[in-house]
């Protein structure tokens, strides 16, 4: 990519969901942009070509005329930057499927906010396993797809171990109303995005159960403490927790009804427990299970996360979880 600094990098966004579409729209709005949105189904790509929109996920929002739509893996050939914008649990299969078409010099960026449930791995670790030799980054922070695609001011974080690469990515992907801050803390940025979804579910449960705003405030602050302990124990930086990908994303996701994780929690709070065999699990539901398991193995105290995991798994109802949290031994904050 550095060798093509005078021309626009070729960017391919894999995943034509709301977030992938929004990111492709921002990137394609720049001068001399070379951006392709890669959909899983040709029907989806064809509809975007026909209408200039992706009404299935972002109804009524026009997309830049220069944005290219495809469903063919060949679109990845010679890509400088590849954004993986599919759900966390689909990353490994997508990497295996598209990997042969991704060049050795490409930078691959995960844009999902979760961890792999079966292994507990960070998504960058999954991509490094499946795409050996590629440089891997992560994009995260407080940004809803509809806001980004509509041109509302949004700031997020892009992280890579090499700060020069993170800066290069930030410059390539930032737009007039979309600002990316580079970071070298790939671990902290990823875990902030995953754990804030868990805490958003907890805040939704509080809202759905009618427990009041004071309880929500307590969950946000105590949840932030849990997030910090977990991130630092996993090798991330405490400063990251206080930034956009930690506190910033937590505040947004735990307070806005645009958040699927918050809405999922509200439904849990109203019903008392998760529906058995629910197929509508959100990222935070998977992350809660993984984080609780890893925290137990590492001896990290995360009572809110453990309670969310137990409720989602149907092992505990909301009232019992609340009683457990409120009856914990009194300790210094």
Swiss-Prot record:
Its EC number is 1.1.1.94. NADPH binds at residues 19, 40-41, 113, 145, 260, 282-283. It catalyses: sn-glycerol 3-phosphate + NAD(+) = dihydroxyacetone phosphate + NADH + H(+); sn-glycerol 3-phosphate + NADP(+) = dihydroxyacetone phosphate + NADPH + H(+). Keywords: Cytoplasm, Lipid biosynthesis, Lipid metabolism, NAD, NADP, Nucleotide-binding, Oxidoreductase, Phospholipid biosynthesis, Phospholipid metabolism. It is an enzyme of class 1 (oxidoreductase). Its main location: cytoplasm. Sn-glycerol 3-phosphate binds at residues 113, 141, 196, 249, 259-261. The active site is at 196 (proton acceptor). InterPro entries: 6-PGluconate_DH-like_C_sf, 6PGD_dom2, G3P_DH_NAD-dep, G3P_DH_NAD-dep_C, G3P_DH_NAD-dep_N, NAD(P)-bd_dom_sf. It is found in: Cytoplasm. GO terms for molecular function: glycerol-3-phosphate dehydrogenase [NAD(P)+] activity; NAD binding. PROSITE patterns: NAD_G3PDH (PS00957). It comes from the Bacteria. GO terms for cellular component: cytosol. GO terms for biological process: carbohydrate metabolic process; glycerol-3-phosphate biosynthetic process; glycerol-3-phosphate catabolic process; glycerophospholipid metabolic process; phospholipid biosynthetic process. Catalyzes the reduction of the glycolytic intermediate dihydroxyacetone phosphate (DHAP) to sn-glycerol 3-phosphate (G3P), the key precursor for phospholipid synthesis. Belongs to the NAD-dependent glycerol-3-phosphate dehydrogenase family. NCBIfam families: PRK00094.1-2, PRK00094.1-4. PANTHER family: GLYCEROL-3-PHOSPHATE DEHYDROGENASE, GLYCEROL-3-PHOSPHATE DEHYDROGENASE [NAD(+)] 2, CHLOROPLASTIC. This is Glycerol-3-phosphate dehydrogenase [NAD(P)+]. The gene is gpsA.
């Amino acid at each position: 990519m550095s060798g093509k600094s005078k021309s626009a990098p070729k960017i391919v966004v894999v995943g034509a969901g709301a977030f992938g579409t929004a990111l492709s729209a921002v990137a394609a709005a720049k001068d001399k942009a070379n951006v392709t949105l890669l959909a899983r189904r040709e029907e989806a790509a064809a509809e975007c070509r026909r209408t200039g929109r992706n009404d299935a996920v972002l109804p009524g929002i026009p997309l830049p005329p220069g944005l290219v739509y495809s469903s063919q893996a060949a679109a990845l050939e010679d890509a400088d930057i590849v954004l993986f914008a599919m759900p966390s649990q689909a990353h490994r299969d997508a990497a295996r499927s598209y990997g042969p078409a991704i060049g050795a010099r490409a930078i691959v960026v995960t844009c999902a906010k979760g961890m792999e449930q079966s292994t507990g791995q960070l998504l960058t670790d999954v991509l490094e396993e499946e795409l050996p030799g590629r440089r891997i980054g992560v994009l995260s922070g407080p940004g809803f797809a509809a806001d980004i695609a509509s041109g509302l001011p949004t700031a997020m974080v892009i992280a890579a171990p090499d700060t020069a690469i993170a800066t290069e990515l930030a410059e390539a992907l930032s737009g007039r109303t979309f600002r990316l801050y580079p970071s070298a803390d790939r671990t902290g940025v990823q875990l902030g995005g995953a754990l804030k979804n868990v805490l958003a579910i907890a805040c939704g449960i509080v809202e759905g159960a009618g427990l009041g705003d004071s309880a929500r405030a307590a969950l946000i602050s105590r949840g932030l403490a849990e997030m910090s302990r977990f991130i630092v124990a996993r090798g991330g930086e405490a400063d990251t927790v206080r930034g956009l990908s930690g506190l910033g994303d937590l505040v947004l996701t735990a307070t806005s009804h645009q958040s699927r994780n918050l809405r999922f929690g509200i439904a849990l709070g109203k019903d008392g427990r998760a529906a058995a065999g629910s197929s509508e699990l959100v990222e935070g539901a998977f992350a809660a299970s993984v984080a609780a398991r890893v925290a137990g193995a590492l001896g990290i105290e995360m009572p809110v996360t453990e309670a969310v995991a137990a409720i989602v798994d149907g092992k505990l109802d909301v009232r019992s979880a609340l009683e457990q949290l409120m009856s914990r031994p009194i300790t210094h904050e």
